[in-house]
């Protein structure tokens, strides 16, 4: 069996490696100093033997619209206490789709950084790093230096105790039986000189057999499907995956595991009353092997029942209502959907900029082509539809936030005399084509057609070329790091209440995801700035700190 799948493998274990000279590693791969970089000196923050206890006041405002249309605003305050366990322990990362472009790049990046393997390129020597990771390669404003008045920034990874990506024990499943060295060669993502050095570390690593239901992915994937859990009994498959997780955890002496889907995009599952609308019905549907229970939902259920976080990195509706309810019942953690790596991230930023500038986007047209297996799978219409849905909703909340530019559903109903459920919205189309010659290099072309002053028009065209897996891989590390962290955070609403885990749906992961999963009934936030601010503010709240204040009164008033 695979050393990273079921058997502990010391030569892949960073805990047993000699300590690296931190001056010789890339800043994004450096370790936090022993005992942590930050210590908050405040009555609101207490450092205990096993964690950090912090008091935080959530300040907001309630707004009531009167019959005359005027708004009544009242300030609100709600007091919380957060407790973050400081011991990270040994963490496993199990990838569904381990042998794909993303999976092989995750393992290769982990090993290259763990062993500090550098390689030759045409531009010179390249050092391993975690560039592209929000957690490892970006900073947050902590405060100001009282002597100089200058802002002080720290890496997000130093805010709270977090697992270092070098320390993940990586394993997982794939419908393809190729060993990881051959899968890496097939992916054609990394430079040959790096691959050459990684082959000895990856040649004995093979993915565990996975689940294959041909109706859920494109028919063109059948030639890869030679590593399958036998049979078509979905209850047996569920128990098989649960056993894999338990065995992986036990054999690698892990304290926790995160499971993440980075496999093929599936078609959407139909939501059927009595089948997948409740937790109990979903469990019964698995027992009867109902055709609308997808592989990704089986993996999500297995993770939930084993009490480990599950993140969906693809756009399909893995989290049918019954799956969310199952997570709620078991107080397990889930997050999704669909990695937000390139074009969509730019789109959410640019659309927000235009709307906040008082400019009205009338249409957004997005064209993509790529040559990797993701593009091949998406060449099938049913799988493309899943991606189209996730990419098309990314500007909804920004449009809804500006009723000056866009008529609301209520306004349209009054104007037409008909019941309108959705307000005015830019025309938005998405096209994705498979072009094998370009490989993992994804080309994206966006046109933004907007209304200006006095009926004027503006056209913006953006051409974006990127390595798909080299953008997605850092997000996978971010999602796993943050999901593990959030399992160690509990809260209570007053000093005498019971400590509780966070709500099951980890919407704090939204920054990394195209179609963020949120608590049922709550509005989705797609604004990249708001998503980033929410993550920063939560990390600060766990330290008892207020969120960043950009008012800078000392420079503007006195």
From Swiss-Prot:
GO terms for cellular component: cytoplasm. InterPro entries: Myo-inos-1-P_Synthase (IPR002587), Myo-inos-1-P_Synthase_GAPDH (IPR013021), NAD(P)-bd_dom_sf (IPR036291). Belongs to the myo-inositol 1-phosphate synthase family. NAD(+) binds at residues 99-102, 174, 210-211, 221, 224, 262-265, 313-314, 338, 341, 372-374, 387, 439-440, 468-469. GO terms for biological process: inositol biosynthetic process; phospholipid biosynthetic process. It is found in: Cytoplasm. Transmembrane segments: none annotated. Its main location: cytoplasm. Homotetramer. This is Inositol-3-phosphate synthase. Key enzyme in myo-inositol biosynthesis pathway that catalyzes the conversion of glucose 6-phosphate to 1-myo-inositol 1-phosphate in a NAD-dependent manner. Rate-limiting enzyme in the synthesis of all inositol-containing compounds. It comes from Cryptococcus neoformans var. grubii serotype A (strain H99 / ATCC 208821 / CBS 10515 / FGSC 9487).
């Amino acid at each position: 069996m695979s050393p990273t799948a079921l058997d502990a493998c010391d030569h892949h274990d960073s805990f047993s490696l000699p300590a690296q000279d931190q001056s010789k590693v890339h800043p994004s791969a450096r370790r936090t100093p022993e005992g942590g970089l930050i210590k908050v000196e405040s009555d609101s923050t207490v450092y205990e033997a096993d964690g950090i206890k912090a008091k935080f006041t959530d300040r907001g405002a309630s707004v009531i619209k009167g019959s005359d249309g005027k708004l009544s605003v009242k300030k609100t305050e709600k007091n919380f206490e957060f407790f973050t366990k400081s011991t990270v322990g040994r963490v496993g990362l199990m990838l569904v789709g381990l042998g794909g472009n993303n999976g092989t790049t995750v393992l290769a990046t982990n090993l290259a950084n763990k062993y500090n393997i550098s390689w030759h390129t045409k531009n010179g020597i390249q050092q391993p790093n975690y560039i592209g990771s929000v957690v490892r390669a970006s900073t947050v404003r902590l405060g100001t230096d009282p002597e100089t008045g200058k802002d002080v920034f720290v890496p997000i990874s130093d805010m709270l105790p977090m697992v270092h990506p070098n320390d993940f024990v990586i394993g997982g499943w794939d419908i393809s039986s190729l060993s990881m060295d051959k899968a890496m060669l097939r992916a054609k993502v990394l430079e040959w000189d790096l691959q050459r050095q990684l082959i000895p570390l990856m040649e004995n690593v093979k993915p565990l057999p996975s689940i294959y239901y041909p109706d859920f992915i494109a028919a063109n994937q059948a030639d890869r499907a030679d590593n399958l859990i036998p049979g078509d009994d979905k209850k047996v498959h569920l128990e098989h995956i649960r056993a894999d997780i338990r065995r992986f955890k036990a054999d690698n002496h892990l304290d926790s595991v995160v499971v993440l889907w980075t496999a093929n995009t599936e078609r959407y599952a139909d939501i059927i009353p009595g089948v997948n609308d409740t937790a109990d019905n979903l469990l019964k549907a698995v027992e009867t092997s109902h055709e609308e229970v997808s592989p990704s939902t089986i993996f999500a259920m297995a993770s939930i029942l084993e009490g480990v976080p599950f993140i969906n990195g693809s756009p399909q509706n893995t989290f049918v209502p019954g799956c969310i309810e199952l997570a709620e019942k078991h107080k397990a953690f889930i997050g999704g959907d669909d990695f937000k790596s390139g074009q969509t991230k730019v789109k959410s930023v640019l659309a927000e900029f235009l709307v906040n500038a008082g400019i009205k986007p009338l249409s957004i047209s997005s064209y993509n082509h790529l040559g990797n297996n993701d593009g091949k799978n998406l060449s099938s219409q049913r799988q493309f539809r899943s991606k189209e849905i996730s990419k098309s909703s990314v500007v909804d909340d920004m449009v809804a936030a500006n009723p000056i530019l866009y008529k609301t559903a209520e306004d349209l109903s009054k104007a037409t005399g008909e019941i309108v459920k959705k307000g005015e919205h830019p025309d938005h189309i998405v096209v994705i084509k498979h072009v094998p010659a370009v490989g993992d290099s994804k080309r994206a072309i966006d046109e933004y057609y907007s209304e200006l002053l006095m009926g004027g028009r503006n056209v913006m065209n953006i051409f974006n070329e990127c390595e798909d897996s080299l953008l997605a891989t850092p997000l996978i590390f971010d999602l796993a790091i943050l999901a593990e962290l959030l399992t160690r955070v509990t809260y209570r609403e007053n000093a005498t209440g019971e400590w509780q885990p966070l709500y099951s749906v980890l919407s704090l992961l939204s920054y990394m995801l195209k179609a963020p999963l949120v608590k049922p009934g709550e509005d989705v936030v797609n604004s990249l700035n708001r998503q980033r601010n929410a993550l920063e503010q939560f990390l600060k709240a766990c330290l008892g700190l207020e969120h960043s204040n950009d008012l800078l009164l000392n420079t503007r008033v006195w």
